[in-house]
């Protein structure tokens, strides 16, 4: 399974991160331990939503969509 996930900083609620992984628990641990350079400044993080995909390509396409302008609007209106 491939997971597209959205996390939100507990200390900086305006900071949202979208990612894709096959091991959600390990990835959340990485974000909260500071081993992920892009997110270490805003830790700790909480998992807001995740979606499971069987197809890796579809997961990465959806992740890219959520990072686009219209995808951010969709995310903010429907997922957060």
Labelled PLM ranges:
Residues 1-37, 43, 47-67, 72, ...:
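GIY-YIG nuclease catalytic motif and its immediate N-terminal context
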């Amino acid at each position: 399974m491939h997971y597209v996930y959205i996390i939100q900083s507990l200390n900086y609620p305006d900071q949202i991160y979208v990612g894709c992984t096959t091991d959600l628990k390990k990835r959340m641990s990485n974000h909260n331990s500071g081993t992920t350079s892009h997110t270490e400044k805003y830790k700790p993080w909480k998992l807001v939503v995740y979606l499971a995909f069987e197809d890796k390509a579809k997961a990465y396409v959806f992740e890219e969509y959520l990072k686009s302008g219209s995808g951010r609007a969709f995310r903010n209106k429907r997922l957060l």
